[in-house]
């Protein structure tokens, strides 16, 4: 009876493993993608592929590092995400974080985003009590954005490099000479472009026909005029956690 049970359990295990293998093989990776991936990451192991919105995404390990790479179906590389330690962050990023509003929060995870033709971005996942935020920094320590991490999704697909129209590129070059373009995305018919200009992160929004709509930047609470700060402090929201 025991031998029979062991045999049955072994068959079940084989069935589960076969099911997992079938799931993995269900993603058809184009030859061009496989060739590009092999050339970029010759030491990759434990490779698993997934189709995410038309992008071929590989999760793998290389030199002991957990990584993820994004390609289109033609084999063009877009982005690589590397799981790194806090100590591996550029000094400018560590300095900015430790001098910022989240310095007392626990750093749960750190990712490095290498992107085709655009700025390298570092993402710190920080948490305190029930709150979690993703903090995006440029290589020279500029805080680009702070996003509540409500669903625990570690996918940084929204940071894939996007091509800008000539009208938008020309406007940014004229209005913000020397600006570095960090990210761009389409949202509700508008194009939102994140740039670094004069050492600050700006978000520039364009509407129909790529016409400029507005530009905004975040400021620290200490930079807010006293009258505004007092009004906020006396409001129902208080000053426990305000993003301006």
Question: Which residues make up each language-model segment?
Answer:
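Acidic/polar, low-complexity intrinsically disordered N-terminal segments immediately downstream
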Residues: 23-83, 87, 94-95, 131, ...
């Amino acid at each position: 009876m025991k031998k029979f049970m062991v045999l049955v359990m072994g068959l079940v295990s084989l069935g589960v493993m076969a099911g997992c293998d079938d799931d993995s093989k269900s993603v058809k990776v184009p030859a061009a993608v496989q060739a590009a991936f092999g050339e970029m990451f010759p030491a990759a192991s434990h490779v698993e592929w997934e189709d995410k919105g038309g992008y071929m995404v590989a999760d793998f390990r290389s030199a002991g590092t957990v990584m993820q790479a994004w390609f289109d179906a033609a084999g063009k590389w877009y982005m690589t995400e590397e799981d790194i330690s806090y100590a591996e962050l550029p000094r400018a990023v560590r300095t900015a974080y430790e001098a910022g509003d989240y310095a007392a929060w626990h750093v749960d995870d750190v990712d490095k985003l290498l992107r085709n033709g655009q700025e390298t971005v570092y993402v710190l996942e920080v948490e305190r009590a029930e709150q979690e935020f993703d903090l995006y920094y440029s290589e020279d320590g500029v805080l680009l954005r702070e996003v509540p991490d409500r669903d625990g999704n570690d996918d940084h697909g929204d940071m894939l490099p996007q091509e800008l129209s000539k009208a938008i590129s020309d406007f940014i070059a004229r209005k913000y000479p020397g600006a570095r373009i960090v990210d761009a995305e389409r949202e509700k018919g508008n194009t939102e472009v994140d740039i670094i200009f004069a050492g600050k992160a700006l978000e520039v929004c364009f509407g129909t026909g790529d016409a400029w709509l507005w530009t905004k930047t975040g400021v620290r609470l200490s930079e807010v005029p006293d009258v505004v700060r007092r009004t906020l402090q006396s409001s129902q929201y208080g000053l426990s956690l305000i993003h301006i």
